Amino acid sequence: MARRFRGESNHKVDSKGRVSIPASFRRVLEAGDPNWQSGGNPELVIVYGDHRRKFLECYTMEAIDEVDAKIDALPRGSMERKMLQRMFHGQSFPTSVDETGRLVLPAKLRTKIALEDEAFFIAAGDTFQIWNPATYDQEELAAAEEWLDELPEDFDPMQYLDGAGGS
């Protein structure tokens, strides 16, 4: 199994859209790029297509290859395949980490998520997300708190994993 992204952090965004990626995230990007060599710059794909999402979803090369294989398995001509190709192929931005561990986010991507001078990075297993910190606080933290408030005080999150399969 591939390494997973873990953790969260805030990073400054400069006027050119450059933002440092958490060091632990860079290690996962390196491990998930079959063409990466020591001293090189790992590649990744940023998907921004779903207009309802207020974040950028960042995939390692291995993770996006898995998505591509699933899309390729859909029937040719199906609406699902067409829309997923548009979202994951057309509305995505292939890029690489620069020599100093930064991403350069184009204005189009920054505008989509209303990103200005600070970015919030949060791990999502085989991907990571980039958010405007205020948007994340308003939407995701509120949803998590609401969900937890509906559960009993002695709730154990591991109970959801019992019988989930895997190894």
UniProtKB/Swiss-Prot annotation:
Signal peptide (from-to): none
Q: Which UniProt keywords apply?
A: Cytoplasm, DNA-binding, Repeat, Transcription, Transcription regulation
The record's CDD domains line, in alphabetical order, gives:
MraZ_C, MraZ_N
Protein family per UniProt:
Belongs to the MraZ family.
| One annotated GO biological process | negative regulation of DNA-templated transcription initiation
SpoVT-AbrB domain: residues covered: 8-51, 92-135
Subunit annotation: Forms oligomers.
What name is this protein filed under? Transcriptional regulator MraZ
Compartment annotation: Cytoplasm, Nucleoid
Q: Which InterPro entries match?
A: MraZ (IPR003444), MraZ_C (IPR035644), MraZ_dom (IPR020603), MraZ_N (IPR035642), MraZ_sf (IPR038619), SpoVT-AbrB_dom (IPR007159), SpoVT-AbrB_sf (IPR037914)
UniProt GO molecular function: DNA-binding transcription factor activity; transcription cis-regulatory region binding
This protein's GO CC annotations: cytoplasm; nucleoid
Q: Which residues cross the membrane?
A: none
Question: What gene does the UniProt entry assign to this protein?
Answer: mraZ
Q: Carries keyword Cytoplasm?
A: yes
Q: Entry's SUPFAM superfamilies?
A: AbrB/MazE/MraZ-like
